[in-house]
């Protein structure tokens, strides 16, 4: 799954969602 990073962010390999005022570099989705 995703790793929460900040209040409204999740980020992990192959996973990213809402940015927290800055942009995350995201890998292609692995579903």
Curated annotation (Swiss-Prot):
The modification 4-hydroxyproline is found at residues 28-29. The keyword Disulfide bond applies. The keyword Iron-sulfur does not apply. Confined to the epidermis and to the mucus layer. Coiled coil: none annotated. The presence of a 'disulfide through disulfide knot' structurally defines this protein as a knottin. This is Nemertide alpha-4. It comes from Lineus sanguineus. The lineage of its organism: Eukaryota, Metazoa, Spiralia, Lophotrochozoa, Nemertea.
